[in-house]
Amino acid sequence: KTDYEANEGRSLDLVTTLGEDVRRYPVRTELFSRDDDLDARVLEHIDAFFAGLPAAGPDHEAATRGPWWFFLSEKVVAITQGRSYFVWDIKVGRPARVLSRYVTRTPAGIGLGSPFTMQLAIQEAGLPRVLYASAGGAIGKVIGRKGLFYELVGNQINAIDGPTEYSAYPSNVSAKLAPKDPDAVAARLSAAIRERVPEPWRSTFGGTVIMDANDIGRNVLGSDVPGDWTRFEEMFA
């Protein structure tokens, strides 16, 4: 598959609820590791995309004449920051084992329903805050208010991912935290992209969006684009 073709079962084009016609180009990469230089890897693919654009056909050149943004998976950022861990390297304590039993699992992923991911949450937010949020979450279930745990715990704990059997290696044996300082990462990447991309695309580049996405929703974790980010979450559908 080239970078100018849709993924299987997907379409390049989308019309948002605001009536915007959007084209999404899924750029395929190799696996990332904590030893990778994120900026260098990203710029390599940006260079290749625009270098191949003229040969891709007039339809693609026409579609890229307007404003555009670069979307990046938060997993890639977290992995290159060293915030992804093999499960055998995570020292799980008793609180994590106990608390993880009371987490409702969803089809979107394991969430904090694993001792490994719960341990990362405790390390990131602190045990007192996790206990406080757990108590609030239990009350939220009684009164019918979903998501109260994540509101109370903060620290982007909702972006923690755990190992799943259907994931490709190493995600099937890893758990990861949310990326650190995603707004700053987005701003840094945008500055580097603006230095590399030729005109006219340099002038129409709007910025970088770091996205957390799964089967039930999308959430922008960081961006250097001002304003409401919900439109970007819809574009990523």
Task: List where the protein language model places each region.
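N-terminal and secondary-structure boundary signal
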Residues: 1-237
